């Protein structure tokens, strides 16, 4: 302590006391706090494991309880409770010590009286033995009162225990009559040890059971004593031994040592053999009592199904609200095959039972078993048949629906437990409506599939495969619901579903559910080839009457009439006719599409002026074969057409003139001359109307025709050519070596496309910034057309620069001239002007004088 005080007084270490970094964690914070429910792990043998060797092989004596005490501790509230319990236990121990002091005196008196009774004759000592027995039993009752709880009721095991005691007593009586007094004593002592062992072993389940057994023994012995006869005098010793066993059973760990000491004192007179037996019994008692004490300390271990909870009526009412009463539903979870008979015979056919037949089809099972079959094994087919139970239930469901639904009241809530379990029970029964028959080539194939697949879960469906062998003499006369002999594994898609009844708390009833395959197929987009090969009967839902008739045929009832058979045949014929009509419609649609593909006519109509005329011309040209003419021939044809038109117009004019002017008209007459002139004017107007409208309109028509020709310019088949832009770019960027290789293979694609750089419509590419081409952009691809555009852009830019330079030079020259003019002195310029004017005046005077 002095050294510690010196360290703390030292200024260098003074901050250690205040700095939390140097503080040690208190012991209560070091351990993990646990609930009182886990208190038993500190002293229960189930949690105890002794280590004889450490991890390096050195011998040690260590147990897991030490580790548990090191790391875990009870919470504060539980520790307070444990403190109160310890007080109560200490008080009980004090009471037990008081009772045991009395018990020692009683046991000594009993031993002395036992010796006296052995020495005396049986006839003379009957009254005394009866009195002693009654006194001993009364004393044992008083000693046991402190250990027996008044609230505990007797268990069922107590009856067995009492019956065994009676049997053992009868054996003891027989031994005593045959042997001498000394042998009697030995047999009696051995009998006591046996009586003590047997109830300890059989009735060591809980402490309460032991205490109930004690009560029954005491009542039985008291009744037996009162009704005893002269031939059963030796039961007194057995009763005394029972009292000793009762005291051993009802005692705790600490009181047990005192009982063993009393047993040893009483056993000194009987011999060394009895001492050894008693020691063994005491050791067993200690172990069992320690376990009982552990259980009593830790309380009932409900997690392991041990112990009972006694609650009041109020608690029972509360729990009844929370947990509903059991309605008697015991579902066969994973035990649907428990009633199936077992046999060693292996056949080539397997039966698949207890599956979700609403979702599973024969092809699903065939695909599954094909993946498990051995090499060389073959599965011929998988057929799904209705069971006899399924037929009966389906008949009932057609009339009134599931029986389980009828038993549920209408006003029952949706989350009602009983109604939900009834539906679950129905779904479990629905698994037995059908069964599948797997036909294999050999018993070896069937046994291999059985070993690998029996009890296996199908995907994640919560339905487990139940396989059984079918004897060879069994035949199936019913029509199968579904058959599968082949599966296209490349196109097959596995089914992912979950049976709600077997995998979830909520239950979905499936008796009126539509076929899931039908839903998926109708929602899917079909291809044209699939529509032709499709079986429409699988996806077209027939009327309810037809369904009933078809199901009656499948069930094979004997009571079906001839008229009903006729109706079903008619319905089948109607369905076939409908299917044939659908197929004809599909064939017509496909033929039209094929014709369209052959013609390759995909027209896009744009309403442009002059479209009708141009379309008529195109049709005429195609009919006459003019579209295949060369440009020169087309030019000649146009000239010929113009000549034909002129000839027609002349002929029409001549006919009109002949019709209008009669033969007897005198043209020299002035009256007729004026009329002829008017007719001429009218002719000219008619000709002009025939030739066309005004020149402005003719110009507009020509312009529209030019636009139309430009639009229809690419309609010629010779000009049509497909090109792959990406391949052109790739081939242009290749090295010379690779280009040569492609040239040899004739796979090199050359860029023959030529851009009209001078087209006025695309001049904005060279001037506007919106269409600027950036060669540094990653999306830029170098082609011949792009190079031409860039060259043209550069050329136009140079031209603009030259124009700018020329304009600048002109301006500079003009500025220089102006500057030169401005550079002359104004006085000098005035002098020059005055000289000029004077010279002009002088010359003018001179001329006048000369005249």
Swiss-Prot record:
- Any one Pfam family here would be NUC153
Q: Which InterPro entries match?
A: Esf1, NUC153, Nucleotide-bd_a/b_plait_sf, RRM_ESF1
Organism of origin: Homo sapiens
Function, in words: May constitute a novel regulatory system for basal transcription. Negatively regulates ABT1.
N-acetylserine PTM positions = 2
Q: Where is the composition biased (Basic and acidic residues)?
A: 101-131, 154-165, 197-210, 564-573, 794-824
Acidic residues: bias regions:
238-257, 268-295, 312-324, 544-563, 655-667
Q: How does it assemble?
A: Interacts with ABT1. Forms a complex with ABT1 and suppresses the ABT1-induced activation of polymerase II-directed transcription in mammalian cells.
This entry carries the following GO cellular component terms, namely: extracellular space; nucleolus; nucleoplasm
Sequence segments annotated as region (Disordered): 74-134, 148-328, 542-576, 640-667, 794-827
- The main location is nucleus
Q: Does the keyword Cytoplasm apply?
A: no
Where does the record place it?
A: Nucleus, Nucleolus; Nucleus, Nucleoplasm
For the modification Phosphothreonine, the affected residues are 311, 693
Quote the biased-composition stretches of kind Basic residues, using this chain's numbering. Answer: 90-100, 640-650
Keyword line: Acetylation, Coiled coil, Nucleus, Phosphoprotein, Transcription, Transcription regulation
Residue numbers bearing the Phosphoserine modification: 75, 77, 79, 82, 134, 153, 179-180, 198, 296, 298, 312-313, 614, 657, 663, 694, 735, 823
- The answer to whether keyword Aminoacyl-tRNA synthetase applies is no
Query: What is the name listed in the Swiss-Prot or TrEMBL entry for this protein?
Result: ESF1 homolog
Superkingdom is Eukaryota
Family of the protein in this entry: Belongs to the ESF1 family.
A GO biological process held by the record? rRNA processing
Where is coiled-coil annotated?
A: 730-824
An MF annotation (GO) of this entry: RNA binding
């Amino acid at each position: 302590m002095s050294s510690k005080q010196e360290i703390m007084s030292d200024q260098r270490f003074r901050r250690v006391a205040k700095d939390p970094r140097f503080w040690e964690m208190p012991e209560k914070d070091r351990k993990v706090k646990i609930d009182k429910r886990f208190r038993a792990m500190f002293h229960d043998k189930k949690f105890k494991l002794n280590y004889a060797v450490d991890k390096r092989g050195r011998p040690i004596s260590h147990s897991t309880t030490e580790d548990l005490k090191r790391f875990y501790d009870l919470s504060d509230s539980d520790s307070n409770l444990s403190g109160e319990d310890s007080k109560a236990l200490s008080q009980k121990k004090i009471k037990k010590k008081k009772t045991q002091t009395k018990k020692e005196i009683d046991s000594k008196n009993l031993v002395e009286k036992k010796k006296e009774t052995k020495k005396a004759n049986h006839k003379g000592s009957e009254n005394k033995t009866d009195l002693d027995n009654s006194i001993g039993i009364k004393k044992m009752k008083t000693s046991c009162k402190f250990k027996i709880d008044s609230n505990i009721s007797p268990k069922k095991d107590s009856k067995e225990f009492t019956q065994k005691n009676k049997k053992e007593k009868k054996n003891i009586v027989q031994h005593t009559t045959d042997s001498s007094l000394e042998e009697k004593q030995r047999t009696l002592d051995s009998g006591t040890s046996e009586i003590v062992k047997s109830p300890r072993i059989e009735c060591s389940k809980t402490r309460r059971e032991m205490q109930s057994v004690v009560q029954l023994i005491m009542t039985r012995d008291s009744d037996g004593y009162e009704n005893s006869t002269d031939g059963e005098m030796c039961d007194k010793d057995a009763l005394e031994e029972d009292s000793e066993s009762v005291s051993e059973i009802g005692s705790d760990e600490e009181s047990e040592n005192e009982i063993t000491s009393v047993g040893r004192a009483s056993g000194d007179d009987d011999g060394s053999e009895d001492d050894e037996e008693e020691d063994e019994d005491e050791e067993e008692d200690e172990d069992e009592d320690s376990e009982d004490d552990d259980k009593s300390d830790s309380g009932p271990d409900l997690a392991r199904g041990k112990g009972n909870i006694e609650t009041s009526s109020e608690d029972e009412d509360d729990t009844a609200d929370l947990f509903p009463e059991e309605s008697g539903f015991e579902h066969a979870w994973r035990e649907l095959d428990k009633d199936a008979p077992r046999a060693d015979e292996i056949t080539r056919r397997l039966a698949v039972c207890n599956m979700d037949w609403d979702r599973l089809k024969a092809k699903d099972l065939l695909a599954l078993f094909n993946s498990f079959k051995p090499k060389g094994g073959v599965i011929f087919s998988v057929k799904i048949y209705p069971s006899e139970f399924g037929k009966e239930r389906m008949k009932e469901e057609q009339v009134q629906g599931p029986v389980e639904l009828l038993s549920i009241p209408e006003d029952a809530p949706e989350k009602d437990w009983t109604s939900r379990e009834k539906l679950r029970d129905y779904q479990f029964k629905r698994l037995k409506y059908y069964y599948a028959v797997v036909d294999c080539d050999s018993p070896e194939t069937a046994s291999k599939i059985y070993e690998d697949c029996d009890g296996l879960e199908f995907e994640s469906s919560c339905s487990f495969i139940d396989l059984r062998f079918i004897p060879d003499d069994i035949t199936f006369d019913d029509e199968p619901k579904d058959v599968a002999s082949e599966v296209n594994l490349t196109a097959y898609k596995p089914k992912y579903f979950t049976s709600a009844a077997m995998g979830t708390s909520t239950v979905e009833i499936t008796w009126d559910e539509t076929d899931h395959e039908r839903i998926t197929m109708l929602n899917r987009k079909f291809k044209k080839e699939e529509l032709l090969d499709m079986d429409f009967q699988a996806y077209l839902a027939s009327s309810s009457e037809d369904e009933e008739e078809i199901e009656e045929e499948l069930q094979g009832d004997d009571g079906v009439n001839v008229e009903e058979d006729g109706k079903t045949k008619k319905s089948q014929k109607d369905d076939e006719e409908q299917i044939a009509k659908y197929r004809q419609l599909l064939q017509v649609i496909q033929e039209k599409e094929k014709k369209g593909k052959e013609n390759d006519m995909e027209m896009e109509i744009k309403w442009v002026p002059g479209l009708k005329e141009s379309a008529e011309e195109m049709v005429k040209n195609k009919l006459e074969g003019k579209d295949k003419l060369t440009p020169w021939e087309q030019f000649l044809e146009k000239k010929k057409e113009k000549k034909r038109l002129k000839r027609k117009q002349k002929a029409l004019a001549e006919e009109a003139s002949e019709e209008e002017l009669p033969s007897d008209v005198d043209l020299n007459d002035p009256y007729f001359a004026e009329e002829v002139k008017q007719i001429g004017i009218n002719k000219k107007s008619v000709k002009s109307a025939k030739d066309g409208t005004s020149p402005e309109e003719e110009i507009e028509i020509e312009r529209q025709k030019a636009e139309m020709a430009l639009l229809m310019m690419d309609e010629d088949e010779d000009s049509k050519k497909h090109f792959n832009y990406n391949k052109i770019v790739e081939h242009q960027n290749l090295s010379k070596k690779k280009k040569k290789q492609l040239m040899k293979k004739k796979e090199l694609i050359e860029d023959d496309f030529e851009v009209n750089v001078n087209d006025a419509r695309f001049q904005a590419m060279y001037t506007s910034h919106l269409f600027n081409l950036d060669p540094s952009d990653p999306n830029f691809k170098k082609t011949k057309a792009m190079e031409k555009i860039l060259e043209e852009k550069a050329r136009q830019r140079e031209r603009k620069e030259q124009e700018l330079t020329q304009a600048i030079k002109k301006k500079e020259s003009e500025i220089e001239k102006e500057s030169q003019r401005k550079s002359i002195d104004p006085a000098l310029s005035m002098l020059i002007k005055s000289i000029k004017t004077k010279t002009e005046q002088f010359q003018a005077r001179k001329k006048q004088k000369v005249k």
